[in-house]
Amino acid sequence: MTAVGEALRRCRAEGRAALVGYLPACFPDVERGIANLQALLDGGVDILEIGLPYSDPVLDGPVIARAADVALRAGSTTAAVLRTLEAVAASGAAAVIMTYWNPVEQYGVDRFAAAVAAAGGSGLVTPDLLPDEAEAWLAASDAHGLDRIFLVAPSSTDERIALTVRFCRGFVYAASVMGVTGVRERASVQAPELVARVRRYTSLPVGVGLGVGTAEQAAEVAQYADAVIVGSAFVRCVFDAGDDAPAALRKLAADLAAGVRRMPATG
C-alpha cells in the first residue's frame, strides 16, 4: 500500500474524510513552492496533490492557469517538480503528482514513473488520460508500485465509470461539477449522486474535487465522500497573501481540516 493508501486508511479509521490539498510545484518559485506545500501539511492536509505546471492547462480555471504560468516563468521543469516531490515526501508526506499527460509522454512514461517512485511519490492524478488509452501508464504504474487516479464526472456514463474505476488504484477522483477548476459558492448538488454511482462499481475511496473552498463546503462534502480535494482556494490564497502565504495557507488548511472533522448535525 502506498503512503496515500495508508493516509486514506488512517482517516477512515478516525471516522472522517481525508483532506487533499493541491498546489502547483514551483509556485511562485521552487523553494517557496516547497514551503507552501509544507504549510498545507502543517495546517492539517492529509494528502498533497502537487501540480506539474503545463503551458496548455485546458481543464484548469483562470486561477490555477495563472499559477501555472507564474511557475513556468520562474523556471519550472519536470526535474524541479520531482525535486519538490522528493522534498515533501522526505518529511513523511503522502503525495501524488497531478499532471496532464503530454509532459509525461515527453519525459518517457516508464522513466517518469520510476522517478516519481524514487522521489517517494505515491502515484499520479491524470485528468486528461482515459484508462483505455493508458496502456503504457498501466504497465509503468504496475512496475513501480504507483497509484493510478483517473477522473469521473457527472457526465460519465455508468459504463465509463465502471471501466474507469476498474483501472484506478489509490482512490477515484470524482470531479463534482462540469467545466474547469475553480471555487464555487456552493458545493455541487451533483456530487453526492456521482459518488453513489461510483460506489456501485468499486470499494476504492472516492475523493470529490472542483469547487470546495470553505470549511462549510468541506464539512458538507465530507458527509458523503472519502476525501475532500481543495485546489483553487489554496492557489488563490497564495496570490492574495504574497510573502505571508505560508501562514495564510496554514490557517486556511486548518479551517478546512476542522471542516472535514465536523460531525453532521442531528435531529
From Swiss-Prot:
Listed CDD domains: Tryptophan_synthase_alpha
Active-site residues, as the UniProt record annotates them: E49, D60
Reactions performed catalytically: (1S,2R)-1-C-(indol-3-yl)glycerol 3-phosphate + L-serine = D-glyceraldehyde 3-phosphate + L-tryptophan + H2O
Pathway: Amino-acid biosynthesis; L-tryptophan biosynthesis; L-tryptophan from chorismate: step 5/5
GO terms under cellular component: cytosol
InterPro entries per UniProt: Aldolase_TIM (IPR013785), RibuloseP-bd_barrel (IPR011060), Trp_synthase_alpha_AS (IPR018204), Trp_synthase_suA (IPR002028)
EC number from the UniProt entry: 4.2.1.20
GO molecular function: tryptophan synthase activity
Task performed by this protein: The alpha subunit is responsible for the aldol cleavage of indoleglycerol phosphate to indole and glyceraldehyde 3-phosphate.
Subunit organization: Tetramer of two alpha and two beta chains.
NCBIfam families: trpA (TIGR00262)
Protein name as catalogued: Tryptophan synthase alpha chain
Organism listed in the record: Acidothermus cellulolyticus (strain ATCC 43068 / DSM 8971 / 11B)
